[in-house]
Each structure stands twice: as C-alpha cells, then as structure tokens.
Curated annotation (Swiss-Prot):
The lineage of its organism: Bacteria, Pseudomonadati, Pseudomonadota, Gammaproteobacteria, Pseudomonadales. This is Cyanate hydratase. Signal peptide: none annotated. It is an enzyme of class 4 (lyase). It comes from Pseudomonas aeruginosa (strain UCBPP-PA14). PANTHER family: CYANATE HYDRATASE. The active site is at R96, E99, S122. Belongs to the cyanase family. It catalyses: cyanate + hydrogencarbonate + 3 H(+) = NH4(+) + 2 CO2. GO terms for biological process: cyanate metabolic process. The gene is cynS. The keyword Phosphoprotein does not apply.
Length: 156
C-alpha cells in the first residue's frame, strides 16, 4: 500500500542524502535509472522528492546508494510536490525555466486553447525528456520535450 507524505521535510532530507551518496559513490542519475524500467527524468525527479517509485525501483536505487529500508519506504511514498518554495526561484538554471514561462507562457496558453480548446496540459499524465545536441554554430543545445495529455474543461 502506498502512503502519502504530510510535509515535504522527510523527502527533502532523503534527497539531500541521495545527492551526497550519489557523489560519494561516483554515480550518475543515469546509473540510478538504469535497470528500473523507468525514465531517467522520472527517477531523477523521484530522487528529489517529486514522485513515488514502485517498490522494485525504490529497492534497486536505495541499494545502489547504500540506503536502508526506511529510505525504500520513503521513495515509495506519495510526496507533497512542488520543489520551488517561496515564489521566484533564485537558482540560475531553474530561473531560466521560470523566465521561459514568463516570456512564452501566454503564447503557449493561447496556442493550446486555439489548437485544443478550453483545457489544460496535464503534468500528471506527462512525460519529460532532455537531450544534449550539438549546435551547428558551435557548443551544445538542450532539447527539452514536455509531453502532457490534454484535459478539456468540462461543464458540470
């Protein structure tokens, strides 16, 4: 049976332990995701306390990180989601995503409504992917795919 968290504290403390153990052991996020049958982005989000993992994946990841049965239980718990407390993010990388939505949010909203109608794009029935590609002009580019199910607004 899955259990729900009542505050973000336990998962946040676990995330700090995950990051420390990952660094101590020289593991990558991909190393942790390999063999779970779950997307890299979802496993990483779970490690940061934003998703629950199935038992087998939680056990595998916890074992790789040298964590105990309590950690396995926490990794399976349904978290209080939302990792940016206090409004506008101050971390430069996270802020760029915030900035993208500040610039393109109303455009995305208008295009979603024009193409789909009144509704939302789900962040629950959702897939996220990130790829590093070479930029023909030099350097690298990040290709980020947000793939969410459209949910129409229904009158009641």
């Amino acid at each position: 049976m899955q259990h729900s968290q009542v505050s973000p504290n336990a998962r946040q403390q676990l995330a700090e332990t995950v990051v420390l153990n990952k660094a101590r052991l020289g593991l990558s996020w991909q190393d942790l995701a390999d063999g779970t049958g779950i997307a890299l982005t979802l496993v990483t989000a779970a490690m940061f306390g934003q998703h629950a993992l199935p038992e087998a994946a939680a056990r595998k990841v916890a074992a790789q990180l040298g964590m105990d049965d309590d950690a396995v239980l926490l990794l399976q718990s349904i978290p209080l989601r939302g990792s940016i407390p206090g409004g506008i993010p101050s971390d430069p990388t996270i802020y760029r995503f915030y900035e993208m939505l500040q610039v393109y949010g109303s455009t995305l909203k208008a295009l979603v409504h024009e193409q789909f109608g009144d509704g939302i794009i789900s962040a629950i029935n959702f897939k996220l992917d990130i790829k590093k590609v070479e930029d023909p002009e030099g350097g690298s580019r990040a290709v980020i795919t947000l793939d969410g199910k459209y949910l129409p607004t229904k009158p009641f």
